[in-house]
């Protein structure tokens, strides 16, 4: 049997579900029960009746799955697959902001540690951030940890006073305005679409910005036969599956998340076979952090 067949057989035997993010290797996406962005994966983790969740993604995703469904065994193919941005906010700064602004809502991007989520009023993902921020009664919003997604939300929701944090995605930050200009020259009249984790000047210079699921849907719905893609290149796997007759060009070959790429099919098999790399979240942290996740799922409906 092939490794893929071994994984599928094992998954059935153990009543396990494999959840994979669009940024992991295509071979891993192919064995997953569900492939999605952070929001869709969080919903699936919350509602699954499987005994074991194998989360093919980075650490904060496994933590979120455990908090949303604490009775399940959550395994990760590689516990060292971490997201640097998830740590890029300071509890001290959050406390200071809360003291400074009376009606402050701390809005925490789901790409954050469980510890940071304990300080948040609500979590958001890139696909529901606009909807949720608009719906909050608070005028003042401290958006953590990603300053670039925060800037994108701030521009779209001018009626709120959105205070930005200085965190960033190390992968999306590599994209420059020069990359966009070069793509315009090489592929004239081809839509350039990017993730709002890119810096603001890049987002402004392109044709569409959205979450990974929104970018995929854009390439399905748009009549163009070609697209320039400005997000982690793992997403091309799903785009090509959904639109096999369309052509996709990477905005830059620098758009590779080394942490997502640590998740291999071999590691998926090993962690499921031996039930290793289980995710645990401190009970006190879980009790505080899960409120912000549950509130997100409620408000994003």
Where are these regions (language model features)?
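Active-site loop-to-helix "anion-binding N-cap" substructures in soluble metabolic enzymes
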Residues: 1-229, 235-301
């Amino acid at each position: 049997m092939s490794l893929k067949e071994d994984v599928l057989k094992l998954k059935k035997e153990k009543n396990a579900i494999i959840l994979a993010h669009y940024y992991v290797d295509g071979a891993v996406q192919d064995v997953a029960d569900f492939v999605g962005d952070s929001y869709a994966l969080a919903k699936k983790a919350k509602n699954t009746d499987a005994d074991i969740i194998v989360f093919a993604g980075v650490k904060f995703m496994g933590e979120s799955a455990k908090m949303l469904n604490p009775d399940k065994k959550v395994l990760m193919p590689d516990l060292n697959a971490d997201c640097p941005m998830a740590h890029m906010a300071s509890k001290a700064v959050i406390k200071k902001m809360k003291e400074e602004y009376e009606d402050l809502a701390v809005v925490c991007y789901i790409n954050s540690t469980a510890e940071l989520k304990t300080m948040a009023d609500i979590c958001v993902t890139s696909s529901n951030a606009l909807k949720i921020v608009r719906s909050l009664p608070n005028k003042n919003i401290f958006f953590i940890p990603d300053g670039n997604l925060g800037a994108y939300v701030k521009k779209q929701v001018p009626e709120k006073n959105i205070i930005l944090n200085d965190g960033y995605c190390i992968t999306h930050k590599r994209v420059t305005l020069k990359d966009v200009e070069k793509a315009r020259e090489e592929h004239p009249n081809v839509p350039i679409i990017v993730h709002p984790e890119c810096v603001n000047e890049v987002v402004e210079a392109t044709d569409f910005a959205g979450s990974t699921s929104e970018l995929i849907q854009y390439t399905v719905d748009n009549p163009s036969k070609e697209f320039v893609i400005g997000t982690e290149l793992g997403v091309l796997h799903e785009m090509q599956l959904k639109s096999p007759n369309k052509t996709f060009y990477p905005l830059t070959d620098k758009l590779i998340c080394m942490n997502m790429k640590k998740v291999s099919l071999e590691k998926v098999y090993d962690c499921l076979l031996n039930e290793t790399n289980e995710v645990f979240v401190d009970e006190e942290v879980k009790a505080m952090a899960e409120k912000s996740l549950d509130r997100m799922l409620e408000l994003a409906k």
